[in-house]
Amino acid sequence: MKKLLYVTVNSKPEDQSASRTVGRALVNEILAEYNEFQLEELDLYKAHIPRLEYQYFASRNCMLDKEALEKLPPKEQEEVHQIVKLCDQFREADVVVIATPMWSLSFPAPLKEYMDCIIQVGRTITFEGKMPKGLLDDRPRTVVYVQSSGADIMWMMNPFFNKGLHYIEDMMKLMGIKKFDDLLVDGTGDTPEEKEKAIEKAKNKINGIVKHLEFEKE
């Protein structure tokens, strides 16, 4: 079985969230198109995402080994285990869908905390000399970033407004993931009509994304 990981970053119920509504439609179409996928869901507003503390690391981005870990208090050991679990869940996925609103030209804080957890030496990156190198180029993977925003963002303003999108894309490349798609739900506006129009416009792009997912075929 292939693994599809669906990460949501919005405290709103799905039927009130444009990003989650479109994200769900994308996930459903992936599952309909490729029956070899098993779905795992991670709600970053409900899951425990540990805050990284210096005592959890042997060196930069490198978690403690078993012997050093056992010297920590039980609560801190649990935090380290959760960080490793989140990282392993991500790297085991063949396709990852992240659904989030744009906040303050970026995204809600839980997504940054999650990214900090999954950037780990020996799991998703390594260092060759002083330069980082991604480890997730061992097989084809795809990440799709679904982002909602109230305004229609013109292409020439994309570098300024879509800082969150570009950050996530850069982090995926850092980890070695080459296939990255965005699905933008722009112009959700202030009225139900504007929101529905933006959702439907984004949904019309789903089929093209699904047809071109890259993952290791059986």
Question: What is each residue range found by the language model?
Answer:
Residues M1-L4, V97, R141-V143, G176-D181:
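Short coil-to-beta-strand
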Residues S11-E14, D152, G189-D190:
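Short histidine/acidic/glycine/proline-rich micro-motifs that form metal-
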Residues Y34-E36, D138, I177:
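Short, well-ordered coil/turn elements that cap or connect secondary structure elements
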Residues E76-H166:
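Helix-loop-strand module that forms the ligand-binding subsite of alpha/beta enzymes
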Residues L26-I30, R139-Q147, M172:
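A short, hydrophobic secondary-structure junction motif
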